[in-house]
Amino acid sequence: MRYNEKELQALSRQPAEMAAELGMRGPKKGSVLKRRLVKLVVNFLFYFRTDEAEPVGALLLERCRVVREEPGTFSISFIEDPERKYHFECSSEEQCQEWMEALRRASYEFMRRSLIFYRNEIRKVTGKDPLEQFGISEEARFQLSGLQA
């Protein structure tokens, strides 16, 4: 997937759902744990050197797995390349849990599944499709048949 660098930098400056200084180790062999400012914006996880305003990198949180490793640590890996893991170290177990939950909820697919679930729940209660008023109820992306388990 291609990204426009200026657009990514602009996105990295947007208000974050979560931000903290965490220990981070990249996927390369021999990579060491470094302190990084980590910032979750929509479905991107930006990471910065602690003394710089521009991100060092970004992870698109789609088709990824967030897994607890040791106490106070978690990793992010991607379905296409499960051996390529990014490791994060939190200051507490509570912080680790908060980050893992936020990262799991950040993907487009999670939001789509939630929308479909709540759409169906509202339809059961009211008998009406809540998306109909927006003129998007027939779009394929909002259909249960397009949902993969």
Curated annotation (Swiss-Prot):
Expressed in testis and liver. One of its GO terms (biological process) is retrograde transport, endosome to Golgi. The gene is PLEKHJ1. This is Pleckstrin homology domain-containing family J member 1. One of its GO terms (cellular component) is cytosol. Gene3D superfamilies: Pleckstrin-homology domain (PH domain)/Phosphotyrosine-binding domain (PTB). InterPro entries: Boi1/Boi2-like, PH-like_dom_sf, PH_domain. Residues 15-108 form the PH domain.
